[in-house]
């Protein structure tokens, strides 16, 4: 039996948000989690919250039942060879690193290592994440269910059968918050030009995004049908839609998504 139920390599913003979400959901206690961070200041902060802390990432790998790899992708070339030298029973590995493939991790840790790749997005830090998961051949269905249950406490989850889908889905979840932030920024700038305060514009637009999202998720109409329902003939909205269509919004988004996906594949080489 391992000393800790859950370990985190890279207890930065996302890694810490995940472990804290699991603790809030009652999946384990803070003292059942071991967090690695090179920063003494961050280790002290996590220790004050009741977590066990360390500056030795091999200790996390050897003493935890499940290990979350939350370090930056460029740090894997340093960490994987060190973890490969660890002896004893292997943990369940959960990686949130974009572009670090099963093949790369298995080459270092062994093909018999149970690995689940997880792609969360930043709203997870507020408990509103959209997370995608896929398991390798060595991971059992029960292990996938265990990890999915963890991320279900922080938003919604989708499981894919094929690893490549984690690249294909990036524009619609992982990168999508930036799309929405850009759209919000453009709307606020436009509102300010028309004499509306930036704060008021942002409040109104954000609530409109929340309400519109709920209408899409909870209703029985498609996005296209909802657009049509708002666009009264000869009204104001249809004039705005005409400009967006003439300027090629759909084509612009399609090109942006294609570039995003292509870059994800490049990072995985």
Q: What are the language-model segments listed below?
A:
Residues 104-114, 130-168, 179-218:
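Internal alpha-helical scaffold of NAD(P)-dependent oxidoreductase catalytic cores
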Residues 34, 40, 49, 57-133, ...:
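Rossmann-like NAD(P)(H) cofactor-binding subdomain of soluble oxidoreductases
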Residues 33, 43, 60, 197-204, ...:
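Small-residue helix-packing motif on alpha-helices
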Residues 2, 206-269:
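NAD(P)-dependent Rossmann-like dehydrogenase/reductase catalytic/cofactor-binding core
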Residues 165-171, 223-228:
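Short pre-catalytic strand/loop immediately N-terminal to key active-site residues, enriched for Gly-Thr
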Residues 1-55, 59-61, 128, 192-194:
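NAD(P)+-binding Rossmann beta1-loop-alpha1 motif at the extreme N-terminus of oxidoreductases
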């Amino acid at each position: 039996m391992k000393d800790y139920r859950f370990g985190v390599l890279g207890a930065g913003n996302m890694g810490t948000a995940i472990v804290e979400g699991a603790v809030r959901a009652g999946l384990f206690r803070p003292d059942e989690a071991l967090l690695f961070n090179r920063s003494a200041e961050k280790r002290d902060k996590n220790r004050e919250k009741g977590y066990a802390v360390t500056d030795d990432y091999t200790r996390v790998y050897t003493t935890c039942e499940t290990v979350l790899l939350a370090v930056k992708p460029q740090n894997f070339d340093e960490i994987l060879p060190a973890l490969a030298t660890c002896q004893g029973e292997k943990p369940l590995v959960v990686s949130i690193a974009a572009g670090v493939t099963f093949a790369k991790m298995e080459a270092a840790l062994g093909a018999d290592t149970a690995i689940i790749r997880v792609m969360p997005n930043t709203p997870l830090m507020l408990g509103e994440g959209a997370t995608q998961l896929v398991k390798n051949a060595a991971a059992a269905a029960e292990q996938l269910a265990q990890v999915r249950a963890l991320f279900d406490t922080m938003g919604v989850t989708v499981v894919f059968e094929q690893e490549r889908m984690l690249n294909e889905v990036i524009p619609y979840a992982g990168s999508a918050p930036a799309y929405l932030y850009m759209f919000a920024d453009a709307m606020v700038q436009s509102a300010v030009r028309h004499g509306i305060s930036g704060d008021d514009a942002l409040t109104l637009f954000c609530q409109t995004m929340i309400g519109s999202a709920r209408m899409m998720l909870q209703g029985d109409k498609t996005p296209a049908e909802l657009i049509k329902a708002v666009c009264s003939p000869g009204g104001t909205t249809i004039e705005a839609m005409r400009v967006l269509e003439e300027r090629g919004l759909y084509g612009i988004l399609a090109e942006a998504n294609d570039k995003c996906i292509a870059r994800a594949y490049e990072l995985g080489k």
